[in-house]
Amino acid sequence: MTWETLQSLKVAAMKACTCLNPLDTAMGMFGCLLGYETIWEQMKDDHIPDLLVGISRESRRVDEDPGVIVPDEFLHEIMTVRYPNPNMPDTSQRIATDTSQKLGIRYGVTLKRYYNSTVPMHRVSRLKFIPLAIAGWLRYLMGVDDNGNAMQLSPDPLMDSLQKRLEGITFGCTDFGEYALESILSD
């Protein structure tokens, strides 16, 4: 394998697992829940930009530096140029499509790195933002926005199966069986 090929694979992995795709997924879920139609509108929210930076920071702690581009500079460009650009018509609904198929690469790789790390500060129990993003997806699966109104869910090949496992859990419910969540997250 050539040096160029290796570096391009590292850059692709950084985008897929750290500085771009995990942020897109979080924006898709929370955008739908909070009623944002487009990605650029979400960047005006008081909390979403902080969530995105937090996810990226948690991911980068255990990610390999690609060496070709600087992850912090790449993230800065995404946060200040790409996401707030009203000429990029990306929608929350489009990004939320097929999320069940994306979670493994977008968050699972990072979670495995935390589990396998021998560095004390790299403990899964220290994570805040990645678990919040995953919780946002579980909340999204309920098909109820943050105002308690039914919302249209984006296509996902596992949607029926996932929603069936969440039966009995309702909006605002705080007492639910862990089995439902464990069965979804272990897939």
Where are these regions (language model features)?
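Non-transmembrane, aqueous-exposed alpha-helical and coiled segments at domain scale
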Residues: 1-187
